[in-house]
């Protein structure tokens, strides 16, 4: 199960067109990443404390400690060395390529959630970036973002779609390598996995893991100077609770968009 989910890591986070959900990137999960997201920018309607059942606390806490240690001991040093070695522009090209590749996830979930303007915009951006951005390496729409952004934010994955359909989180979960999730979001990972073109690449299991790991190291390297995960956890009395509550609030915001 873990190996299967590892192959789908960060699909929903990157699908949003952001660099990644900061927590998911930090613990090799979305993001949701990279896009890069700001937990402090929630609308007033989300200021009220959001909660979710956490009956698997000891399982979750164990894997949270594991993921956090792995981040600080391995993934952050790797991303730091990679950022020192490779200039920012090529790393941005790599990020653009993977974001562009996840077009099917965004398009399908925009259609499923009735965001037809966002679906149309995703098609337009995909064609433009693929045709004129060297297969997605360049983001030719970035210079005029107001011309390419739909009225409502684009859907980021099947977890958001399930939430809009009325499915609650279920219980809170933390997966090794993937980071924070829930029953609903874990089911969403499966949908994202099967809509991700990379899933169907002619690669061995180890090659697939290597490609996805590289994708996440690259995304993390672009977040090092403004790392929301570290900002969130460094001053927290209870790092586990801080990450859990921020994640639930973030997903509630995405579902309401």
Predicted feature descriptions by range:
Residues 96-183:
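Mid-length scaffold segments of soluble, non-membrane domains
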Residues 14-113, 206-257:
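N-terminal targeting leaders of membrane proteins
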Residues 170, 181-226:
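Cyclophilin-type peptidyl-prolyl cis-trans isomerase
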Residues 79, 159, 175, 187-191, ...:
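Generic detector of well-ordered alpha-helical segments enriched in charged/polar residues
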Residues 1-9:
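Bacterial N-terminal signal peptides
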Residues 127-144, 197-203, 238-257:
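Contiguous hydrophobic segments
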């Amino acid at each position: 199960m873990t190996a299967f989910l590892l192959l789908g890591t960060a699909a929903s986070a990157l699908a949003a067109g952001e660099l990644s959900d900061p927590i998911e990137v930090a613990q090799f999960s979305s993001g949701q990443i990279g896009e890069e997201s700001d937990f402090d920018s929630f609308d007033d309607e989300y200021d009220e404390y959001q909660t979710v059942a956490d009956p698997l606390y000891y399982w979750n806490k164990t894997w949270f400690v594991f993921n956090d240690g792995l981040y600080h001991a391995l993934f952050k040093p790797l991303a730091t060395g990679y950022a020192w070695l490779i200039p920012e522009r090529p790393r941005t090209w790599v990020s653009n390529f993977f974001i562009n590749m996840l077009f099917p996830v965004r398009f399908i979930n925009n259609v499923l959630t009735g965001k037809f303007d966002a679906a149309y915009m995703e098609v337009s951006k995909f064609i433009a970036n693929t045709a004129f951005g060297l297969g997605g390496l360049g983001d030719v729409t970035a210079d005029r973002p107001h011309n390419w952004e739909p009225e409502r934010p684009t859907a980021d994955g099947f977890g958001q779609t399930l939430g809009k359909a009325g499915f609650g989180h279920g219980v809170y979960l933390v997966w090794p390598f993937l980071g924070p999730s829930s029953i609903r979001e874990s089911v969403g990972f499966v949908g994202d996995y099967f809509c991700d073109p990379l899933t169907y690449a002619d690669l061995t299991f180890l090659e697939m893991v290597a490609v996805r790991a590289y994708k996440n190291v690259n995304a993390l390297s672009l977040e090092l100077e403004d790392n929301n995960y570290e900002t969130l956890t460094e001053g927290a009395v209870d790092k586990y609770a801080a990450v859990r509550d921020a994640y639930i609030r973030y997903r509630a915001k995405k579902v309401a968009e």
